[in-house]
Amino acid sequence: MASNLTLRIAFAGVAIPLAVGVLWLGGWPFAVVLAALGVLGTREIYDLARRQGIDPLDRTGWIAAAAIPLLAYWAKGSESHWAEPALYFGALWLMVTLVVAMFRRGPAGKPLAAVAVTLFGCLYASALLAFLIPIRHGTNAANQPFAYLCLTLFPLVITWIGDTAAMAVGVQFGGPKLAPVLSPNKTRSGAVGGFLGAVVVAVVLGLLVLNRVGWNFAVWQLIVVGGVVGIVSQVGDIAESLFKREAGVKDSSSLIPGHGGVLDRLDSLYFVVPAAAGLFRLFGVI
């Protein structure tokens, strides 16, 4: 137990500064890191599916997972009308995937399930994280890099502090389970604590940090961001628990010492990042 905790602390001590550094750099280095995380997460989803008798098209999915963040960054910085070509590219990729599944697998190889999991894996593990790109590289990011760095870190920090608050309140007060079948350690009191913690930290960070580096969030907007992040982060956590329960495993992989896999570490962020990007877009921030 002690050695596992030491590994977790050591990994966090290295990973957090690296993550902040990559976010500060932005650009292609940031897109490449997202592509790598997308491929690793996609691979873990495929491994979970394979435990249930579904054999995804690995290479096809990995290529798509790597391409999504790279194309998202290219499109963000391009003045061309990229949306229509992207739709054609997506349709072509789907058709190629289905053709490969049909000819390589045949009816006995469950081609429909293989294609469905192949598509889901890369969209879930890569496309959802790619919403960090429009946050980090918003309209005026070139002139205000520090402001956009803080904006990108904002939902991430809310998530981590909310998760810590949920754990602390759950341990302290206990009570009825939130999702006893999927995540037996989570309690309703912890869920409430995590939600309130997310709202409080969103307001505090928004007023004391974001609004001092160039943003102008109203208190009600910060409450909305904190509330939404406080809810969807817990939903994302439980969703990943569902995947693992279905596959009969404790962790999505053993890639990260003391932490499990990429899915285990980023589970909440798959829901938080697109939700935050949508709210920032709604508020006219990005």
Regions found by a protein language model. Name each.
Residues 170-172, 242-247, 270, 274-275:
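Re-entrant/interfacial helical elements at transmembrane boundaries that shape
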Residues 13-14, 253, 270-271:
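Hydrophobic alpha-helical transmembrane segments of integral membrane proteins
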Residues 162-165, 192, 263-273:
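Membrane-embedded alpha-helical segments of transport systems
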Residues 278-286:
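Juxtamembrane boundary at the C-terminal end of a transmembrane helix
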Residues 1-227:
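Membrane-embedded alpha-helical bundles of polytopic integral membrane proteins
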Residues 228-233, 268:
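Transmembrane alpha-helix interface/packing and boundary motifs in multi-pass membrane proteins
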Residues 245-268:
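Interfacial loop-to-transmembrane junctions
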